[in-house]
Amino acid sequence: MIGRLRGIIIEKQPPLVLIEVGGVGYEVHMPMTCFYELPEAGQEAIVFTHFVVREDAQLLYGFNNKQERTLFKELIKTNGVGPKLALAILSGMSAQQFVNAVEREEVGALVKLPGIGKKTAERLIVEMKDRFKGLHGDLFTPAADLVLTSPASPATDDAEQEAVAALVALGYKPQEASRMVSKIARPDVSSETLIREALRAAL
């Protein structure tokens, strides 16, 4: 269906971005590790997408490159892992960090992600390790790791509320999300920075 979008960013409301292509606005759900890399509103962006059809919704998930999208597709094939949980996984750690955690069988790192218990972490390691072999080890290389840069957008008065809302959307409970943000909140910081630091602190 829709595999790639090239258009102007109209609005950024993590983890959602609205991209206008040919007069049509597409709402795209993105992992926060990809969201951080987006240009500012009003600028052009290219996003690789995966289209998910449910009984109650049709959703687009977006990524900065094909490798991240491939990993997302492999994740949602795992028993007990749907698109929302896969999005949370790739928001809590970069694609390369996840690949490294699986290859090193780091259950402790995976269970810190929202919605991941010990059994799910162990299942991910077993199933994803086999899939990585099937991809001939070419899914990612160390050089492909994401470099998270500080967003240039100015902080807003409701940055903390936006950060909490984004964490809830990623699977954290409201009280837990509020606590995570309050620990690292400070004046004049954008919501994207708060989200990134909250996720880092959680790991």
Swiss-Prot record:
Annotated stretches, region: Domain I: 1-64
Chain intervals for the UniProt region annotation (Flexible linker): 143-154
Metal-binding is among the record's keywords: no
Domain of life assignment: Bacteria
A GO BP entry: DNA repair
Keywords on record: Cytoplasm, DNA damage, DNA recombination, DNA repair, DNA-binding
Keyword Transmembrane helix: no
Molecular-function GO terms, alphabetical: ATP binding; four-way junction DNA binding; four-way junction helicase activity
Record region (Domain II): 65-142
Subunit structure of this chain's protein: Homotetramer. Forms an RuvA(8)-RuvB(12)-Holliday junction (HJ) complex. HJ DNA is sandwiched between 2 RuvA tetramers; dsDNA enters through RuvA and exits via RuvB. An RuvB hexamer assembles on each DNA strand where it exits the tetramer. Each RuvB hexamer is contacted by two RuvA subunits (via domain III) on 2 adjacent RuvB subunits; this complex drives branch migration. In the full resolvosome a probable DNA-RuvA(4)-RuvB(12)-RuvC(2) complex forms which resolves the HJ.
Function comment: The RuvA-RuvB-RuvC complex processes Holliday junction (HJ) DNA during genetic recombination and DNA repair, while the RuvA-RuvB complex plays an important role in the rescue of blocked DNA replication forks via replication fork reversal (RFR). RuvA specifically binds to HJ cruciform DNA, conferring on it an open structure. The RuvB hexamer acts as an ATP-dependent pump, pulling dsDNA into and through the RuvAB complex. HJ branch migration allows RuvC to scan DNA until it finds its consensus sequence, where it cleaves and resolves the cruciform DNA.
Family label: Belongs to the RuvA family.
Protein name as it appears in the record: Holliday junction branch migration complex subunit RuvA
Organismal lineage: Bacteria, Pseudomonadati, Pseudomonadota, Gammaproteobacteria, Enterobacterales
